[in-house]
Amino acid sequence: MANTASAKKMTRKIAKRTAINRSRRSRMRTFVRKVEEAIASGNQQDALAALRAAEPEMMRAAQHGIVHKNNASRKVSRLAARVKALAA
């Protein structure tokens, strides 16, 4: 339990920040799931549209420190490769 006023304030700030981070992470995962569902359905047009929507969302999460920049880039790259493979 926080004893000082500043510690209590930090507890409030951390709770607020945690909620924001949780929301951003969830939003990113939702976009990734939509891409994976489109890939599973085999429709390249839908998968490409979903990927184009997901990429900025993933990079935004990386910018805010939700995931590491390299992690987001790797996921985008792997999803793009899977979408490209649908055309073949």
Swiss-Prot record:
Keywords in alphabetical order: Ribonucleoprotein, Ribosomal protein, RNA-binding, rRNA-binding
Positions of region (Disordered): 1-27
Keyword Ribonucleoprotein: yes
GO MF: small ribosomal subunit rRNA binding; structural constituent of ribosome
Entry keyword annotation includes Ribosomal protein: yes
GO terms classed as biological process: translation
Domain of life: Bacteria
Any GO CC annotation of this UniProt entry: small ribosomal subunit
InterPro entries linked: Ribosomal_bS20, Ribosomal_bS20_sf
Listed HAMAP family: Ribosomal_bS20 (MF_00500)
Family, as annotated: Belongs to the bacterial ribosomal protein bS20 family.
Role noted for this protein: Binds directly to 16S ribosomal RNA.
Identification of the protein by name: Small ribosomal subunit protein bS20
Organism: Methylobacterium radiotolerans (strain ATCC 27329 / DSM 1819 / JCM 2831 / NBRC 15690 / NCIMB 10815 / 0-1)
Encoding gene per record: rpsT
